[in-house]
Curated annotation (Swiss-Prot):
It comes from Rhizobium etli (strain ATCC 51251 / DSM 11541 / JCM 21823 / NBRC 15573 / CFN 42). Activated by phosphorylation. Transmembrane segments: none annotated. The active site is at residue 102. This is Phosphoglucosamine mutase. InterPro entries: A-D-PHexomutase_a/b/a-I (IPR005844), A-D-PHexomutase_a/b/a-I/II/III (IPR016055), A-D-PHexomutase_a/b/a-II (IPR005845), A-D-PHexomutase_a/b/a-III (IPR005846), A-D-PHexomutase_C (IPR005843), A-D-PHexomutase_C_sf (IPR036900), A-D-PHexomutase_CS (IPR016066), Alpha-D-phosphohexomutase_SF (IPR005841). Keywords: Isomerase, Magnesium, Metal-binding, Phosphoprotein. Binds 1 Mg(2+) ion per subunit. Catalyzes the conversion of glucosamine-6-phosphate to glucosamine-1-phosphate. The modification Phosphoserine is found at residue 102. PANTHER family: PHOSPHOGLUCOMUTASE (ALPHA-D-GLUCOSE-1,6-BISPHOSPHATE-DEPENDENT), PHOSPHOHEXOSE MUTASE.
Length: 450
């Protein structure tokens, strides 16, 4: 069944435009609060946000919704998404909320929900919330004497700082390393530099002056040019680029080259396998991860399990099959020994541990495999279902047959935008470009005809 509100990572959209309005945010609070208001204990919700201008508006709306449903609301202010997941558990809350649109520009915002175990909600529970949102919620309001209380909680940043520091092996310090970090003017602008400094690094920070409208603006993991320049300027050993809510990371090596999530997963998998920390004898990634990663792992006797796009699906597969390393090419790295969702800072600390233990440079540590040529293009759609068209399906089948075992083809609708994503990869770059261009043309023709 097609969902109206939830996408691959919660609810997301332009602020003050449906569905990302204060009215819907309040209704989500009532609906989600109703579902998690079970048992006789006093029910609680923890609410965090990033640094977007609209965060204050949506935070107040969600506090109103949850307290109207009878839950006490713990308000955290700007804090990373993985910290919200961690605090949902440690504060014994029934549900956790992160108000963020991750790597999107400030005009957008979103709502991510976590269960009491710190994991993102399942499709089934999100469907329950959607079902309630379509009904009259007045019947779900708490009695007058059961309305929840709202409280701003102090000291939560220190809790997350200590949690992140504990993920670095105790025999490792960051002394002697110059680390440049770009906080994307986002949720980690205070905590990330503090963690690195307390672990001994010489820290150079950019993207740590949020003003409500500059989150992810020419900074962060999706725009690493500023960090590349800073690494060169200060001769840093490594650059760490987080996104707006700090659940993803991209590394810049000492030469200014970008290291994506696939390479980071390869480093962590190999390092953890050597220390016998790796579970499942492999890792979990999405269909978008490079074929080079799969070959790298296979050569070392490790497996790559693939899921559909979205870190929540990576986490679900990890939980079901006892893996402890997973992630996405985009830099969502999930290390279940340390958390329940992607954590850019914790992932970066594992890379720093490998650098310190081996005594090698970041470029030497992080270039674990040669990626095969990969091309991703998007087709914007305004309606219809072009992937169900017979001509498109035949073109896809022909392309898959041509690639055979020498490449891969992934075609899927975006979970957050009105786009169809076409990705192909293989050893022959010219072949890949031709296949993608032909498929784009076929899909565009069908869309135009419709």
């Amino acid at each position: 069944m097609k969902r109206r509100y939830f996408g691959t990572d919660g609810i997301r959209g332009q602020s003050n435009v449906f569905p990302m309005t204060p009215d819907l945010a309040m209704r989500v609070g009532i609906a989600a609060g109703t579902i998690f208001r079970r048992g006789n204990h006093r029910h609680r919700v923890v609410i965090g946000k990033d640094t977007r201008l609209s965060g204050y508006m949506l935070e107040n709306a969600m506090v109103a919704g949850f307290t109207a449903a009878g839950l006490d609301a713990f308000i955290l202010g700007p804090i990373p998404t993985p910290a919200v997941a961690m605090l949902t558990r440690s504060l014994r809350c029934d549900i956790g909320v992160m108000i963020s649109a991750s790597h999107n520009p400030y005009e957008d915002n979103g709502i991510k929900l976590f269960g009491p175990d710190g994991y993102k909600l399942s499709d089934d529970i999100e469907a329950e919330i959607e079902d309630l949102l379509e009904k009259d919620l007045n019947a779900q309001l708490a009695k007058s004497d059961d309305i929840g209380r709202a409280k701003r909680v102090d000291g939560v940043h220190d809790r997350y700082i200590e949690h992140a520091k504990r993920t670095l092996p105790r025999d490792v310090t960051l002394q002697g390393l110059r680390v440049a970090i770009d906080c994307a003017n986002g949720a980690a602008y205070k905590v990330a530099p503090a963690v690195l400094w307390e672990l001994g690094a010489d820290v150079v920070t950019i993207g740590n002056e949020p003003n409500g409208t500059n989150i992810n603006l020419n900074c962060g993991s999706t725009s690493p040019v500023a960090l590349q320049k800073k690494v060169d300027e200060v001769r840093a050993d490594i650059g760490i680029a987080l996104d707006g809510d700090a659940d993803r990371v991209i590394i810049i090596d000492e030469n200014g080259s970008i290291v994506d999530g696939d390479q980071l997963m390869a480093v962590i998998a190999e390092s953890w396998a050597e220390s016998q920390q790796l579970r499942g004898n492999g890792i979990v990634a999405t269909v978008m991860s490079n074929l080079g990663l799969e070959r790298f792992l296979d050569e070392r006797g490790m497996a790559l399990a693939r899921t559909k796009v979205g870190d929540r699906y990576v986490v679900e597969h990890m939980r079901q099959h006892n893996y402890n390393v997973g992630g996405e090419q985009s830099g969502h790295i999930v290390l279940s020994d340390y958390g329940t969702t992607g954590d850019g800072l914790v992932a970066a600390l594992q890379i720093l541990a490998a650098v310190k233990r081996t005594g090698r440079t970041v470029s030497e540590v992080c270039r674990r495999f040669e990626p095969v040529p990969q091309l991703l293009r998007n087709v914007r759609i305004s309606g219809g279902k072009p992937l169900e068209d017979i001509q498109v399906q035949k073109a896809i089948a022909d392309a898959e047959a041509e690639l055979a075992r020498n490449g891969r083809l992934v075609i899927r609708p975006s979970g957050t935008e009105p786009l169809i994503r076409v990705m192909a990869e293989g050893d022959d770059r010219a072949q890949i470009e031709r296949i993608v261009n032909e498929l784009i043309g076929t899909i565009s023709n069908v869309r135009t005809a419709a």
